[in-house]
Amino acid sequence: MPRKGHISKRDVLPDPIYGSKTVTKLINNVMYDGKKGIAQQICYDAFDIIKEKTGRDPLEVFEEAMANIMPVLEVKARRVGGATYQVPMEVRPDRRQALGLRWLVDYSRKRGERTMRERLSGEILDAINNMGGAYKKKEDTHKMAEANRAFAHYRW
């Protein structure tokens, strides 16, 4: 914990094409070694592929996909009298978004398509159809929280 009081969160600027802060956060998650231009190109190309395949606004599709992969519950380890319990907790909205974006990018990188733009668009399209690695990760997280519901009274 910081000694000098609360540290405020740094606000991100909306991206230039879609005007969305969530897209900027996606770009930042895709970015490697500070190469933001390449990350932007990957994301915008992925959005073009989505527009081509669905015929819908890619931002709308992306928001829908994010809603499908953002977790509502997660488990946190809590030590009580020598035993460690997995205690189900609600996820804060900012953490929900961060986890959703992280899972989306991580599982995009693990896919088999040739280029990252194809992998990212594929994972987003899978997420709106309730499929794909990121959606499965959310479901697993929820199952884990449900299985440990008995320890919910250890919440803090």
UniProtKB/Swiss-Prot annotation:
Q: Which GO terms describe its biological process?
A: translation
**According to the lineage, what is the superkingdom?**
Bacteria
What GO molecular-function term can you cite, just one? Answer: structural constituent of ribosome
UniProtKB keywords: Ribonucleoprotein, Ribosomal protein, RNA-binding, rRNA-binding, tRNA-binding
Alphabetical list of PROSITE patterns matching this protein: RIBOSOMAL_S7 (PS00052)
Question: Where are the coiled-coil regions?
Answer: none
InterPro entries from the entry?
A: Ribosomal_uS7, Ribosomal_uS7_bac/org-type, Ribosomal_uS7_CS, Ribosomal_uS7_dom, Ribosomal_uS7_dom_sf
CDD domains (UniProt xref): uS7_Bacteria
One Gene Ontology term, aspect cellular component: small ribosomal subunit
Q: What does this protein do?
A: One of the primary rRNA binding proteins, it binds directly to 16S rRNA where it nucleates assembly of the head domain of the 30S subunit. Is located at the subunit interface close to the decoding center, probably blocks exit of the E-site tRNA.
Sequence similarity: Belongs to the universal ribosomal protein uS7 family.
Assembly and partners are described as: Part of the 30S ribosomal subunit. Contacts proteins S9 and S11.
Q: What is this protein called?
A: Small ribosomal subunit protein uS7
Organism of provenance: Ruminiclostridium cellulolyticum (strain ATCC 35319 / DSM 5812 / JCM 6584 / H10)
